[in-house]
């Protein structure tokens, strides 16, 4: 609302005198308010609750374990034949191992207690309460390197001032990596983050040789992805054109780091029940890289040199990492882990009858050196040309679990909540959600078998696709490896002792009862006879 004042000048003449009077009129005018109006939410927002609110746990526990899991391959790159088919895969101690554990459907189990669940309104799910990740093979440190690493000067202990690198100053350099032990457990795949090439705002203003723009990206961690080895989590394939800035096992790959912040902020907590992490690293050597420096050091940050130092040296420094000592005193594996309270809202419930276990262990990264002779006879003198050298890396795992049988009562509120979280769960449980009534007018023909009209057959329902079929995991099938005899397995015995469960003795000592005097006949004595 605004006020407008109008001034009117009124003149009057009296006796040759001129008088002027000011008359003010006030008029009210409405105009549109410039402030924004914020509407309240249309209704109450459904809050995310813990699985303990709608999952009822039973006193039935089961053990499940995998067989001995082995992986053998080349530690730096996959080997291919002439047709491009991989003959020897890449198996490195600095890769993620993402196990996709498939569990049986508890609703198809035959339990001795027939009144355990009401099939009309209840469904069964598995709850993970214990896990043990076993690791075989001895402790060791594996090294990596590059025969053409872009290493120019030793900037830690320089022998001179290098200002004029040649056309090719690459050298053969090897190193060990950052030490990492990691374990992530959830019912959906883990997420990883890395720095990749982004899209510039003004693509026309970018010239060849400009520094690429980077952005933080998040992807699913797959089995075989490289971990952070000390050179950063980044896409080396798109951000390092020389292919000489990192060791061979990182060239043309992505190094991912677990997105702990993103998984912790996930509303339902399915991807991260819990995680264990141990990282350590120090820097061993310091170098700089040859090449034209893209970001020139500002002239106001130094005083120009003279003679051989008139040209400033390259300032692109880098270091070689090292994970230092590996010891059995700081191992995260080969010990039981009990889940009492998960980090997120999902307290260990295995929705979809599956579990994802992500493992990183660089403390057993020893590379095996193999040698084969090209001559069937033993040479009398040593000749390098008569021997072929090979590299292989081996890994050994063993997974053991303790699962608890749980019940979900599907009332309307719980069904709505689960449908919002994952609609496929209700489909697997043979529960459907009726679609809203359509307000449009639909066509219905009288004669369906009529050549005069288009075919009226309904399209066959599409088979539900695996949502993770485009990702690579190490599939572990435990559908036929469940057992209720906990004391027959190592992790089961540990759980029985931890939980205070005392199994019933199977072998009972039965004492022989003495005969009663009322029923037994007196023993007759033998008469003595004279001879």
From Swiss-Prot:
UniProt keyword terms in alphabetical order: Capsid protein, Disulfide bond, Host nucleus, Host-virus interaction, Late protein, T=7 icosahedral capsid protein, Viral attachment to host cell, Viral penetration into host cytoplasm, Virion, Virus endocytosis by host, Virus entry into host cell
InterPro entries found in the cross-reference section: Capsid_L1_Papillomavir, Capsid_L1_sf_Papillomavir, dsDNA_vir_gr_I_capsid
A GO BP entry: virion attachment to host cell
Compositional bias annotation for Low complexity: 512-523
A GO molecular-function descriptor: structural molecule activity
GO cellular component: host cell nucleus; T=7 icosahedral viral capsid
Principal subcellular localisation of the protein: virion
Cellular location(s): Virion; Host nucleus
Keyword Disulfide bond carried by entry: yes
Domain of life: Viruses
Region described as Disordered: 500-531
Complex formation: Self-assembles into homopentamers. The capsid has an icosahedral symmetry and consists of 72 capsomers, with each capsomer being a pentamer of L1. Interacts with the minor capsid protein L2; this interaction is necessary for viral genome encapsidation. Interacts with protein E2; this interaction enhances E2-dependent replication and transcription activation.
Function: Forms an icosahedral capsid with a T=7 symmetry and a 50 nm diameter. The capsid is composed of 72 pentamers linked to each other by disulfide bonds and associated with L2 proteins. Binds to heparan sulfate proteoglycans on cell surface of basal layer keratinocytes to provide initial virion attachment. This binding mediates a conformational change in the virus capsid that facilitates efficient infection. The virion enters the host cell via endocytosis. During virus trafficking, L1 protein dissociates from the viral DNA and the genomic DNA is released to the host nucleus.
Family: Belongs to the papillomaviridae L1 protein family.
UniProt xrefs under HAMAP family: PPV_L1
Protein name, as recorded: Major capsid protein L1
Organism this protein belongs to: Human papillomavirus 43
Gene coding for it: L1
